[in-house]
Every structure is written in structure tokens, then in C-alpha cells.
Curated annotation (Swiss-Prot):
Keyword tRNA-binding: no
GO biological process terms held by the UniProt record: taxis
Entry keyword set: ANK repeat
Name of the protein in its database record: Protein MGF 360-12L
InterPro entries: ASFV_MGF360
Originating organism: African swine fever virus (isolate Tick/South Africa/Pretoriuskop Pr4/1996)
Lineage top rank: taxon: Viruses
């Protein structure tokens, strides 16, 4: 839709750095949202306010305004270029529905359009965005129009390590439960602290899921927060197994090792999942499950069997700090290079 002169003026004003003593002007122009001034980043097309400091893209901001039945902002965001059809996924009153139609929205969205809006809205990995996505799509009847398998494919792709190597997200869960676990997992994967706390406070029955995601996605900071502060515990060997299912998970593996996890079992798990960097890291920490690892592989896996057959490995001579402090672990492992991996890579196999 063509913007009015007034909306263009507001757009320019929202892009300015307005002094605090002139915020009353922004209130007069309805550039006020969640107890703070609305600002608009023209380059990134991000809407920000006191309640959404990380920002929402224009279409997502429209979805939020529609959900809140904020008619002034719905009109404003539509005039600024937001796709009014996006509002149809969060519309919840007849009056707002009528307004969206007046602004050019379609009568209904088809399956492909709904799925594309879902994909677009979940793209930005910020706390504000993930919380909004959860609120919009939780038990949303519009998702009934989308093929269940297509929705699951979109969810499973980002959580494929958990899907492939655990049974935690099998088909017995409803789509609503699956989506809830998905948003929680994304918050942990990208260490979105505000979103993590939102889900933790609201869904205490998913505490084990939080710990599992922190282990799998190598988020040693939230792992420590959950384990030490919030006292979310599980068997240490199961924790180590989950940490080993994804390669390069050195931080959460080491955390479990310091807690007393069996490093030989961790080496075996890493071998079974063909996670070579994890395997070498276990060797650095003193693991020596070479024969057991070769047997566990069975047929095939020539490369890893060749690695295990060599008698050239030994524990790292420079010990890592025995601490569960996530800052210390992160600092120690940020640029970590496995001693035993380097030995193998420089070994003359001829």
C-alpha cells in the first residue's frame, strides 16, 4: 500500500536519535510501544522499543502488533512496507481481521504461504523473536492447514543431531509439544538468555530437555546455569553420552569429565557416532579404549580403524584446568588443538 505523508514523516522521525526530553513528540505520533519509543533501523528494517531491544524485522513487528490488536501500529507498519498477510497468522479478533482486510490482506492463507511465513519468522535468532514465535504458533489452529510432515521436516532439520541420535523427539509428541521443545532448543543453541529464562520459568516440566539441549549444543554456560544454579541433574554418564553425540562438543564433554564422567566411555560413544575430534579429545584426556572402539565399529569405517590401530598416542602433557567454571572452560578450549590429532596428521603412514 502507498504510505501517507504522515506515515513517511513518522518513519523519518523513528530513524532519528530523539532526546529523552522530546519523547513526548513520539507519544503524540504514536511512536510508542511497550513503555518506550519506537525506533526504526532503515538499513536492517528493524523495529525496536523498550520491550524489544534486540529488534524485530518489520513483518515480525506487524505480527506482534496484530496479536496485541494495536490498530495504530498495524496501520503504521503496513504503510512502512510490512506484508499485511503476515498478520493473518496472529489475528485473534474479528475487528483486527477486518482491519487487515482493509489494508489489503487476503481472505485466507494457503498451506505454502503459512509454511513460508513460519520459516521467515523463525529466521532471526533473538530472544524477542523466539518468544514471539512461540506465543504466535503455540496451539495456533492455522497450522492445521499445513501438512504435519512438512512442519516436522522444518523443525527436525535444525535439531537433526538430537533427532538422529536420541529418541527424544519421536512421533508420539503432538505438533504443539514439538514446537515448544523446538523453540526452547533454539534458545539454548544460540544462548538466548532471556528466552531460556522465559521457557525455564514457564515450563518446569522441560528441565531435563533444557539440560539435554545444553549438552548437545555445547552451551557450557547454560549447562552450568542449569546444573549448578537450578539443580537440574541427570546421570553423569548419560550427560556425557549426550555431549558426545555431536562433534566439536569439547566444552560440554569436558564439563562432564570434570564432574566424573567416564572418559573411556566417552571415547567409545564418540567412535560409534564417528565424531573424530571428540575421539581425539578423549585421548588427550587419557582415554585408551582403542581395542573396544575397533570392535564397536564392526565392518567398514576404515579411516577411524586405521587411526585406532596406531600405537602413537598418549595423554596431553599440559593439563587443562580442573574446573566447571564455564568462563575458564570456554577460555581454555576456544582455540584448542588436539595433541593426538596433530600427531596423527603428521604421522607418516607409508
Amino acid at each position: 500500500m502507498l504510505p501517507s505523508l504522515q506515515s513517511l514523516t513518522k518513519k523519518v522521525l523513528a530513524g532519528q536519535c530523539v532526546p529523552t526530553n522530546q519523547h513526548y513528540l513520539l507519544k503524540c505520533y504514536d511512536l510508542w510501544w511497550h513503555d518506550g519509543p519506537i525506533t526504526f533501523d532503515h538499513n536492517l528494517k528493524l523495529i525496536k522499543s523498550a520491550g524489544i531491544k534486540e529488534g524485530l524485522d518489520l513483518n515480525t513487528a506487524l505480527v506482534k502488533a496484530v496479536r496485541e490488536n494495536n490498530y495504530n501500529l498495524i496501520k503504521l507498519f503496513a504503510e512502512w512496507g510490512a506484508n499485511i498477510n503476515y498478520g493473518l497468522v496472529s489475528v485473534n479478533t474479528e475487528h483486527t481481521w477486518d482491519l487487515c482486510r482493509e489494508l489489503g490482506a487476503k481472505e485466507t492463507l494457503n498451506e505454502e504461504e503459512i509454511l513460508q511465513i513460519f520459516i521467515d519468522l523463525k529466521f532471526h535468532k533473538t530472544s524477542s523473536n523466539i518468544i514471539l514465535c512461540h506465543e504466535v504458533f503455540s496451539n495456533n489452529p492455522i497450522l492445521q492447514k499445513v501438512n504435519n510432515i512438512k512442519m516436522r521436516i522444518e523443525i527436525f532439520w535444525e535439531l537433526r543431531e538430537l533427532i538422529e541420535k536420541t529418541d527424544l523427539l519421536n512421533n508420539e509428541f503432538s505438533l504443539s509439544t514439538l514446537l515448544l521443545k523446538y523453540w526452547y532448543a533454539i534458545a539454548i543453541r544460540y544462548n538466548l538468555k532471556e528466552a531460556i529464562q522465559y521457557f525455564y520459568q514457564k515450563y518446569t516440566h522441560l528441565n531435563t530437555w533444557r539440560l539435554t539441549c545444553a549438552l548437545c549444543f555445547n552451551n557450557v554456560f547454560d549447562l552450568h546455569e542449569a546444573y549448578e544454579k537450578d539443580k537440574i541433574h541427570m546421570d553423569i554418564e548419560e550427560m556425557m553420552r549426550i555431549a558426545c553425540i555431536k562433534d566439536h562438543n569439547l566444552s560440554t564433554m569436558y564439563y562432564c569429565y570434570v564432574l566424573g564422567g567416564n572418559i573411556n566411555q566417552a571415547m567409545l560413544t564418540s567412535i560409534q557416532y564417528y565424531n573424530i575430534e571428540n575421539m581425539f579429545f578423549c585421548m588427550d584426556l587419557g582415554a585408551d579404549a582403542f581395542e573396544e572402539g575397533t570392535i564397536a565399529l564392526g565392518e567398514g569405517y576404515k579411516l577411524i580403524k586405521n587411526i585406532l590401530s596406531l600405537k602413537i598416542y598418549s595423554p596431553a602433557t599440559t593439563p587443562l584446568p580442573k574446573s566447571t567454571d564455564p568462563e575458564i572452560i570456554d577460555h581454555a578450549l576456544k582455540n584448542y588443538v588436539s595433541k593426538n590429532m596433530m600427531i596423527f596428521l603428521t604421522y607418516d603412514l607409508r
